[in-house]
Structures are given as C-alpha cells and as structure tokens.
Amino acid sequence: VSLVWSGGTANYPTEAIQDFPVLPEMPTTAEGTIDGDTLIAAMLAALPYVATDTARPVLSGVTLVLGSPIEVAAGDGFRMSHQVLGLSFPLEAKIIVPAHAVNILGHVFAKAPRTPPSSADSLIPIITAKRQLHMALTGENKVRLDFGRTASVVINLVQGDPPEWLKLVPKGEPMLQSQVFAPQLEAAVKRVRAVAKDGKGIVRMVFADGNLTVSAIGEDQEISATMDTLNTQGEPGRTALNYTYLLDYLSGKQVSSSSLNTTIPAR
C-alpha cells in the first residue's frame, strides 16, 4: 500500500488475504442492541479490579451479569467493583470477558464512527446520540459485538463460573459512614503516598470531629493531611487501606463526592 500526499510518501507491506482465517458461521443463542457508551465505559472502569495473576482464571476478566438489569463486576480477591447499569439483555446469563479483550473493545469502540440518527436535522443530535452496539452470545462460549456496520469483535470468553459478587458485599448498616469530596481525598492520599510506599503501602484514615486525617508511616518518617468531611456517622472511627487501591478508585472520578463505609468495628 502506497500513500502519497503533498509533503511525502509512505509504503507499507501487506499480507495475503488468504492468510487470514475466515470467521465460521456460528449459531446465536441470544442477541440484543445495547447502549455502547454505558456498557463499554463500565467495563473499562472495572479493569483495575481484575486479578493480574493466572492462578484464578475466573478473576482474570470482567464479569457481565446479563438480563434486566445488566451488571458489571470484577475482583482480584482483595477488592471488587460492582455496577448496576440501566440496560437489559434478552437472556439471563453470566459471562467473563478477558481483561485484554476489554481493552480491545475500548479501542475499537473509540475508533468506530458514530452512526447518525436517521432523522437528524442538525449536528447536535448526531454528536449527543448514544452509540448503540449489537451483542450476541454465539458459538461455544463466545460473544460477538458489532459496532455499527464498520467493525465486529468476536471474543473467546473465560471458562468457568464467576463468584457470586453480591454475596461478598457485607449486609447491614455500616459501623462508620462518611461522605467526602473525592478530589480532596485523592489529593490527600497523593500527599502521603511517598511515605506510604516507603513503608508497607498502607494509608490510615481517622474520622473525628467532622474531620478526616489521612496519614502514612514510613521507615523513618510520618506524614498526615487533614480535611473536612461532608457528613460522617459513627465517628470517632478509623480504618486503613492500601494507597494504590484508594487511588485506583478515586482517580478520574467524575463525581464531586464519594462515600466511605466500613462494616467492621472501626475504632
């Protein structure tokens, strides 16, 4: 393939089309049209919680609980993410999408052109329209996602049954519940993370008198940052978390506040 433009040229080698396998016809178990903007964003948001080791394959991907509503979950044995989406699929099923396949879906979805509404009379409906994708459970443990008429992705799903994610969520009222400004908490954790990293990676959080004190202890130093909370019930109380877990959760949050709950005695 040769490309020529008014400032230069470029040549790229090509492969013979017969070297690429033809996708076989596969029976479809169930299919439906889904809001791709919501689904893909939720799957990408779950990626940081996926296990990175191969010892537990069912934790190495993002779980989709299909039905009405669709749920997205992931966990690595230490933490988990669970999202309930306002979407539906005509068949109730649980599938596990490999982590690398989720990244591929995000890339293809970002590059696929929007399909404008058939009755759009201005640019606004085209720009703001939700991007729909067609999803089908097909073949033997596979899922196919069609991005309009321009691209399709067929994924081999992870074999096995995912955990019962909701059973891992503690029931009952939390011992301590606090609402804080997410960007402010993120800044406080970043302020102490160097010392936390020098120690055991732990960030301590103490709730008292309407304040939250975030601190870390290293080998030869200690650092802390104090911030106001919006609302706290159950104080005084304290808890501790790995700083990377906190930052993975807080990083890029589009909301101004976040709620922290502990279900074990936090004193």
Kindly label every feature range from the protein language model.
Residues 1-267:
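Structural preference for solvent-exposed beta-strand-turn elements
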